[in-house]
Amino acid sequence: NKSKKRRNRVSFLGAATVEPPKPIPLTWKTEKPVWVNQWPLPKQKLEALHLLANEQLEKGHIEPSFSPWNSPVFVIQKKSGKWRMLTDLRAVNAVNAVIQPMGPLQPGLPSLAMIPKDWPLIIIDLKDCFFTIPLAEQDCEKFAFTIPAINNKEPATRFQWKVLPQGMLNSPTICQTFVGRALQPVREKFSDCYIIHYIDDILCAAEMKDKLIDCYTFLQAEVANAGLAIASDKIQTSTPFHYLEMQIENRKIKPPKIEIRKDTLKTLNDFQKLLGDINWIRPTLGIPTYAMSNLFSILRGDSDLNSKRMLTPEATKEIKLVEEKIQSAQINRIDPLAPLQLLIFATAHSPTGIIIQNTDLVEWSFLPHSTVKTFTLYLDQMATLIGQTRLRIIKLCGNDPDKIVVPLTKEQVRQAFINSGAWQIGLANFVGIIDNHYPKTKIFQFLKMTTWILPKITRREPLENALTVFTDGSSNGKAAYTGPKERVIKTQYQSAQRAELVAVITVLQDFDQPINIISDSAYVVQATRDVETALIKYSMDDQLNQLFNLLQQTVRKRNFPFYITHIRAHTNLPGPLTKANEQADLLVSSALIKAQELHALTHVNVAGLKNKFDVTWKQAKDIVQHCTQCQVLHLPTQEAGVNPRGLCPNALWQMDVTHVSSFGRLSYIHVTVDTYSHFIWATCQTGESTSHVKKHLLSCFAVMGVPEKIKTDNGPGYCSKAFQKFLSQWKISHTTGIPYNSQGQAIVERTNRTLKTQLVKQKEGGDSKECTTPQMQLNLALYTLNFLNIYRNQTTTSAEQHLTGKKNSPHEGKLIWWKDNKNKTWEIGKVITWGRGFACVSPGENQLPVWIPTRHLKFYNEPIGDAKKSTSAETETPQSSTVDSQDEQNGDVRRTDEVAIHQESRAADLGTTKEADAVSYKISREHKGDTNPREYAACGLDDCINGGKSPYACRSSCS
């Protein structure tokens, strides 16, 4: 025997001796001594330390020292009352500064299930293994320590270790090496025995008991030759055996019967240790990952080991499950002649693997609770678990499993090999059987399964005959989609990707039919493709967790399939896809966002949005149509009519009092509207007496200026002498309408309704929660109506018209035919001003202007030779289109406001008076600042050769 020859030598007396084992030297990164002062020790502990040191000195484990190195030493008392000496080697163990680590020789515990079943066992424990292994002579001084003297009354005593000190970084590795060398001859001679060695614990198994005894006898001799000793009181020869804290029976392996203390679980470190211990025995217990999710969740958050943690009720239930499994769980010792198989179960959260032999459970296999990737497909998890467990089986027995059983059909397995890189890696070089038939046993029935293994709703190819929807998101928090319909969603996120994720979720919720989704975010596309069957990695970002979970729930709840793909944004490529994506991008542009925000605050109308922001008519209409308040309050409009109007700002006002009950004491709303510009001013009052009217008018003067004329109803506050005196002081003329007939006040009556509607919109559907008082609410409504809204046939706001006198009608100054209802004839005139449903016409030089409905107007578009015939409806038919059709020809398709100020009742057309006409004519001439008669020449030409002196001469000459 070569090994025996190496160990045995012949002395000069002729007797055989045993050569002592050769020490293993340590590698040091520095030769600079490390000295850590010894701290003072109590008298009792100091006495115990002296006794222990003398004992170790007698055994030859330590020796006196004068080393420049020093490590503190201390003692602890065991439950038995005996003392134990320990050395604080933390400074010496500093990996990056002092000592070179050797690395572990046994990185994991051996599986006891690999011990052949029914084989007899012997288990031994080496006594004081570290103290029987010598240190290299040059390393001894590095492990010196000092025993101090009380009050320094005598010199301290110093020693250094000659054997492996407990607590040294490389002591376990050196111990494993020494014991392994001692056992090598045993393994070589008894190769058919099964021997497990871990640190200083040794297990021997043999098929026959006689063989086991022979192996044990030889092992005793080899251990003694190596200078090691067996603890005689720890030899086990009968069941149940206890090894590596597990209980071994003839065919079963059971975990230790322990109870988990919950009262000590207070910090992250406590829970980390607990879960580390549970994970150590999970391959035996068989607790799936999903059954410990709440315990794993406690580890999230602050990484400080002392940070506080609390045991939740759900986690308490999971600890109880662990305790129950500890009491009942068991695995089986194997038959060395039978192959192993791997079963993959599609459990919730992540798949579970089981190593079996026939129907006997050998070991459980699980994936970590947390993954590296944000989304991990379930199929990829299965592939990872297969690869992981295959390596485990090869490590246990040296062979691949004979069969792998998966919850997939043959076609699904074939597709997995084609499409999944993870599947190809997990099953690389596997030559066994892939099956989907599970053994019939009750062992696995408690597992909670999932059906989300492969996608059911998500498609990898575009759907035919399906709607196509484009999505987009912006960093301003807006998400949108466009397709059969458009929608813009305001989100709380300041990330374009998260906003786009909201857009995709909204599309999946809004379209209950097959759809193709096109997004310009590759991140969102990939997430949506994978989320159906994916395990979502937990993130410290709660918002992101909520979004991903909502996306997964939305996809899984769908009844119809969808396909999603990526398109590059902001390219110059031609085609409908690029244009549609640009349209989706416009929906979340800053201009559109600002328009949405303004409408949410003020409920401005479509034309106002179009005028103020760079948005299309369709986008402006969509904003108003998607507003729930504006939809409810979109009232039908009446046919337009005519009330006398001013021809310039502050020429003619109408004034009235309306009521808003929600304003309480201030429910009397005094309203004034300028009939030229439609500028509105209103104040909240506690009544409608003359004093309240005067107070309101003074407020109007401060904002609008002083009018020339005011028209009111016949209320007491307007007919009093005090009010007449007030108007006289301000040089304002006053007229009233027909008693009990509101048609003469149609403009202000409609204004009342407009104002009330706007108040309701802003109160129930606006973002203006800071407007709490009645006057604040009223001011916001007035701001919207005056400075934001634009009405049909207008190009500017009421405020701009009032302040600048700018005209709105594109027809002003045009030559027209107008119908004289008294004479039933058509006359030629010139438009002074034009509104929706009304117009003011100048019949000719030195004639008062006439207010008429637009249905009595015709455009003059060709000359007529006979002047007398031209004025008769019987002799000449006007050759022109109607006003309404002309509006369309001029492209005036702007959407009217729901409650536009100028939509008065047509029944008020007859309210025109000669006095009003005269005033209007005067105002018009003064406002124009033009005394040249040519301004009102019948032909309408500024360079009329007749100077506009005679309409008939003008017609005959200019024609």
Curated annotation (Swiss-Prot):
It catalyses: DNA(n) + a 2'-deoxyribonucleoside 5'-triphosphate = DNA(n+1) + diphosphate; Endonucleolytic cleavage to 5'-phosphomonoester. Gene3D superfamilies: 1.10.10.200, 3.30.70.270, HIV Type 1 Reverse Transcriptase, subunit A, domain 1 (3.10.10.10), Integrase, C-terminal domain superfamily, retroviral (2.30.30.10), Ribonuclease H-like superfamily/Ribonuclease H (3.30.420.10). Residues 872-884 have a biased composition (Polar residues). Disulfide bonds: none annotated. Residues 645-806 form the Integrase catalytic domain. Mg(2+) 2 binds at D472, D585. It holds the Pfam family RNase_H. PANTHER family: ENDOGENOUS RETROVIRUS GROUP K MEMBER 10 POL PROTEIN-RELATED (PTHR41694:SF4), ENDOGENOUS RETROVIRUS GROUP K MEMBER POL PROTEIN (PTHR41694). The LPQG and YXDD motifs are catalytically important and conserved among many retroviruses. This is Endogenous retrovirus group K member 19 Pol protein.
